[in-house]
């Protein structure tokens, strides 16, 4: 690989991905080149014949090989863009989808007249929905809930990186089952800063009643019927977490989560999306 240039490396990556049947072979090859080299597209067009080091070429072709194996691009770069923000993602969370932005936009529209809204994001995953709302509404606070502790680690990381940690709290719970034991954001962040865990624990002030009224519950739960998962593209069925996809027999299992909410959640203004 001596004397490999940016242009030559990109062409090689495009060819490998195209032969592997990757739909966006050209774009993905470019994005991986940008990720590995740190060079912008403008730099590439100006200095495409510039040589790259052997280590850079090897790293690039390694990622190209993994992408050719249908590992999602975002799992390779650990970057996903949603509502204009960059989120960290890995194999433990769904990659944020652009069409989910309409859910965030609808929530923001519904809460226009609500001052200091409190939001519950059920099945939070990477936290992209809740965090995006908090970025748009500086007066808002929210709780993100997920069954997966590994997913919650990702959500906490994103809340810190995007500077909304003081407005967010995260709870490990099977839907509403543990919601009586909400861990407040400040205490939660202190705990995870010391120990890399998101296991459900109560704050030191354990005599507090953590039930509260939410202005909105928002959720993008698993909705794919079990039998249809095998028909999905490899990037999804082989690499996205199964529990984030599987909506059980008819795909509607988790839409029933609203039936149980009244036991522990009080509504003030807006409602359930």
Segment roles from a protein language model:
Residues 2-52, 56-60:
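A short N-terminal interaction module
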Residues 7, 149, 252-256:
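Non-membrane alpha-helical structural segments and their capping/turn regions in soluble enzymes
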Residues 34-109:
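Conserved AdoMet
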Residues 96, 125, 251:
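Short glycine/threonine-rich catalytic loop with a Thr-x-Gly-x-Asp
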Residues 101-198, 202-231, 257:
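Conserved SAM/SAH cofactor-binding pocket of Class I
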Residues 223-253:
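Mobile active-site "lid"/loop adjacent to the S-adenosyl-L-methionine
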Residues 249-273:
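Conserved Class I SAM-dependent methyltransferase catalytic core
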